[in-house]
Amino acid sequence: MGEAQLLVEDGNQKLFPCEVCGRCFATDVLERHGPICKKVFNKKRKPFNSLKQRLQGTDIPTVGKSPQPKVQPVRKSNWRQQHEDFINTIRSAKQFTLAIKEGRPLPPPPRPTSNPDYIQCPYCMRRFNETAAQRHINFCKNQTSRPVFDPIQMAARLVSRAQCKAQASLKK
C-alpha cells in the first residue's frame, strides 16, 4: 500500500486509489476491496439477455433455440459451359450480321442450352429453378385444368342466345 499514491484527503481520512478500478478507498477498506476487485475484473461477463428478463414473471415459456448451422449445398461450378454458350452466341451473332450485310439467307438460330439444375414443367415444358418450379407447376396445373372455350362454340352460343331473346320479345 506504500506505493499507492495519496489521492484525496477526505476530512481526517486519507483515500488511496484502487490499482484495478481506480476508485478511492481508505486503507483498511482498500485491503478488502483489492482482491475482490481483481477477481471481478478478471471474470468474463455473460451478455445480458433482455428477452429472458422481460419474460420473467409471465406465463410465456422460454424455449431455448439451438443455433442450427445453415448448410448450403455446394453447387458445382458450370462456368465452362456458360463460357462456351457465350462464345457460341457471339459467333452466331457475327454470322447473322454478316448474312444481313451480304444479303444471304439468315443462318438458323443457335440451339438453346438447358441448365441441368432446372426442373421442367410437365404442363408447358418450360424450365425453372427449384423454388420457382414449385410455384409455377401448381399455377400451370390450375391453368391447364380450366375449361378452354372454343371461339366457334362461343359464337354459336351467342347466336342461339340472341335468337332466344328475339323469340321471347315477340311473345310478349
Swiss-Prot record:
Gene encoding the protein: Zc2hc1b
Source species: Mus musculus
Record protein name field: Zinc finger C2HC domain-containing protein 1B
A Pfam family of this chain: zf-C2HC_2
Matching Gene3D superfamilies: Classic Zinc Finger
Keywords tagged on the record: Metal-binding, Repeat, Zinc, Zinc-finger
GO molecular function: zinc ion binding
Entry-linked InterPro entries: ZC2HC1A/B-like, Znf_C2HC_C3H
Zn finger intervals (C2HC/C3H-type): 14-43, 117-146
Binding-site residues, Zn(2+) 2: C121, C124, H136, C140
Residues annotated for Zn(2+) 1 binding in this entry: C18, C21, H33, C37
Cofactor(s), by name: Zn(2+)
